[in-house]
UniProtKB/Swiss-Prot annotation:
GO BP annotations listed: actin filament organization; central nervous system development
Protein name as annotated: MARCKS-related protein
The protein's role, per its UniProt record: Controls cell movement by regulating actin cytoskeleton homeostasis and filopodium and lamellipodium formation. When unphosphorylated, induces cell migration. When phosphorylated by MAPK8, induces actin bundles formation and stabilization, thereby reducing actin plasticity, hence restricting cell movement, including neuronal migration. May be involved in coupling the protein kinase C and calmodulin signal transduction systems.
Family in the record: Belongs to the MARCKS family.
Lipidation feature positions (N-myristoyl glycine): G2
Self-association and partners: Binds to filamentous actin (F-actin), but not to monomeric G-actin, independently of its phosphorylation status. Interacts with calmodulin.
Region named Disordered: 1-198
Region annotated Effector domain involved in lipid-binding and calmodulin-binding, chain positions: 87-110
Residues annotated with Phosphoserine modification: S22, S36, S41, S48, S71, S93, S101, S104, S119, S120, S132, S151, S162
Modified residues (Phosphothreonine): T14, T85, T148, T170, T182
Underlying gene: MARCKSL1
Keywords: Actin-binding, Calmodulin-binding, Cell membrane, Cytoplasm, Cytoskeleton, Lipoprotein, Membrane, Myristate, Phosphoprotein
Record keyword Metal-binding present: no
Length: 198
C-alpha cells in the first residue's frame, strides 16, 4: 500500500498539511463526504431545527416515544443476563440398541417421571441385568429356534451367545448357527427379534 505522501502532487506537501489548508476539509468534509458526529451546524450556538423535522411539530402532537414501563418478566430479564438461566438436563433416549466396550445398552420402557439417576441403572447393574436377561431369553429362543429354524436364525445367534454365557447346551445352538444365513420375511435386520421387541 502506498503512503499518502507518495500520492501527493508535490513531494514537499503531505496529506495532513493539504487537509489543513483546504477550506472544505475544515467543515468536516473528507474525501467528498461530509462527516457528522452529533450536531451538524458548525456554529452550535444558534437554534436550528433538527434535520428530520421541526421541534414544534413533535412537541405539539405529544407523540414522543417513551419507553414503556417494563413488566415483571422484562424486569427479571433486565436484571439477570439471559445466559444465567438454569439449563434443563436433556434426557437421552436410545432409539436403537448398541454396544459400548462390551456392554450392551437397550432402550428402557419405563413410563415413570422419576429422577434420572433412579430410572437409569449404573453400568454394573445394567451388565448384571443383561446377563440374567440373556439367560432367560436364551431358553425361550432355543425353543422357538428348534420349531422354526429358517425364520429364527437371527435369534439363533443370540441363543448361542446366551448358551455360551450359561455354559450349558451349545450343541443345540451349534447346528442352527452353521446353516447359511438367509433370513426370510421382513426380518432382514441383523439384530435379534428379541431386542427389537423390547
Amino acid at each position: 500500500m502506498g503512503s499518502q505522501s507518495s500520492k501527493a502532487p508535490r513531494g514537499d506537501v503531505t496529506a495532513e498539511e493539504a487537509a489543513g489548508a483546504s477550506p472544505a476539509k475544515v467543515n468536516g468534509q473528507e474525501n467528498g463526504h461530509v462527516k457528522s458526529n452529533g450536531d451538524l451546524s458548525p456554529k452550535g450556538e444558534g437554534e436550528s431545527p433538527p434535520v428530520n423535522g421541526t421541534e414544534e411539530a413533535a412537541g405539539a402532537t405529544g407523540d414522543a416515544i417513551e419507553p414503556a414501563p417494563p413488566s415483571q418478566g422484562a424486569e427479571a430479564k433486565g436484571e439477570v443476563p439471559p445466559k444465567e438461566t438454569p439449563k434443563k438436563k436433556k434426557k437421552f433416549s436410545f432409539k436403537k440398541p448398541f454396544k459400548l466396550s462390551g456392554l450392551s445398552f437397550k432402550r428402557n420402557r419405563k413410563e415413570g417421571g422419576g429422577d434420572s439417576s433412579a430410572s437409569s441403572p449404573t453400568e454394573e447393574e445394567q451388565e448384571q441385568g443383561e446377563i440374567s436377561a440373556c439367560g432367560e431369553e436364551g431358553t425361550a429362543q432355543e425353543g422357538k429356534a428348534a420349531a422354526t429354524p429358517e425364520s429364527q436364525e437371527p435369534q439363533a445367534k443370540g441363543a448361542e451367545a446366551s448358551a455360551a454365557a450359561k455354559g450349558g447346551d451349545t450343541e443345540e445352538a451349534g447346528p442352527q448357527a452353521a446353516e447359511p444365513s438367509t433370513p426370510s420375511g421382513p426380518e432382514s435386520d441383523p439384530a435379534p427379534a428379541s431386542e427389537q421387541n423390547e
